[in-house]
Regions:
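Accessory C-terminal segments flanking Radical SAM cores
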Residues: 194-304
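Conserved alpha-helical substructure of the radical SAM core
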Residues: 12-14, 20-133, 298-304
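Boundary detector for helix-to-coil junctions that initiate low-complexity/charged tails
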Residues: 1-12
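Conserved AdoMet/S-adenosylmethionine-binding subsite of the radical SAM
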Residues: 102-221, 225-230, 235
Length: 304
């Protein structure tokens, strides 16, 4: 996509596009977009304020049924301020886990907007906590122009009552939101063996990369990961949740804040990774009505 098209995209999102003056744009790469005079521009980026979740969905790509933990607010702010000196995302998402479980989410939203004044900010939530959301978070969502993506995971009367109560709260406050029907498009990020433990696929890396739609980088532990899903897998393996079958993920090296501009661009330009082989070549969709049951039924700390 040429520079003019990117400007048109930002304008359609209600954002100014002076960011792209004197910018070389490479839209055909899923992560790397281009560079301006000071920072590298990327298409999608996310953070996980918490990996804990109030749901226990089977085949969750974040392994949140088994992992838990919340990033301290000052630590998350430090990550954002550090990396904002090097990169500018067009789209920046707060995911997890369930981000509304973070006790100071409003501070994280405020700092993110201060770091990236023209970036589209999006909060991903399963919606069940929206009806009880703190006023401070609502006010932060509004003043920082944060859009909300509500993921609907199940479809039964009791769940729907709670879910749409949260959606109604967004309507009342005039917050921009959209709904993702995860109950219709939920797929397996991994397989389960005879012991009900997660095991990776054994795919052709190029084929898995080609069909992948989750090409979103993530900042975690003050490092930049090329792929959010890969970041989850690495952390879960390091925590002992995943077995030795996942060791190939550990070969990936995320970027640290002391990387050079050239190293950053090269990292975002690399395309298919050998580690892509742990993901499916073709997604298998399921109905996410079954909760995850781990053989040991225990949680592991995600953040050390």
């Amino acid at each position: 996509m040429q520079q003019k098209s990117v400007k048109k995209h930002l304008k359609s999102q209600g954002q100014e596009h002076t960011l792209f003056s004197s910018t070389t744009v490479h839209w055909f790469f899923p992560f790397f977009v281009g560079t301006n005079r000071k920072r590298v521009l990327i298409r999608f980026l996310e953070v996980w304020p918490t990996i804990s979740c109030n749901l226990r969905c089977e085949y969750c790509g974040a392994f949140s049924p088994l992992m838990k933990g919340t990033v301290p607010t000052d630590e998350m702010i430090y990550w954002l301020e550090t990396w904002s000196k090097k990169i500018v995302p067009l789209n920046f998402a707060f995911s997890g886990g369930e981000p509304l479980l973070h006790p100071k989410l409003e501070a994280i939203l405020d700092v993110s907007r201060r770091c990236w004044s023209r970036t589209r900010l999006e909060l991903l939530t399963n919606g069940l906590l929206l009806s009880k959301i703190r006023t401070e978070v609502l006010e932060s969502i509004l003043r920082n122009n944060v859009q909300v993506l509500v993921t609907k995971h199940f479809d039964n009367p009791e769940y729907n009552e709670k879910f749409f109560a949260g959606v109604e709260m967004l309507k009342q406050y005039g917050i921009i939101y959209s709904i993702r029907r995860s109950d219709q498009f939920w797929f397996k990020y991994y397989q389960l063996n005879h012991e009900n433990r997660p095991v990776p696929f054994k795919s052709n890396s190029c084929k898995a990369w080609k069909q992948c739609f989750a090409k979103i980088g993530v900042i975690q532990d003050n490092e930049l990961y090329y792929c959010g899903l890969l970041g989850h897998m690495i952390k879960a393996r390091q925590a002992g949740v995943l077995g030795a079958e996942w060791d190939i993920t550990l070969s990936h090296r995320p970027l640290t804040p002391d990387c050079t501009r050239e190293e950053l661009v090269q990292y975002l330009y690399q395309g298919v990774l050998k580690e892509c082989c742990v993901c499916a070549e073709k997604y298998e969709y399921i109905v996410p009505q079954k909760l995850y049951k781990h053989v040991e039924n225990k949680h592991y700390s995600y953040f050390g």
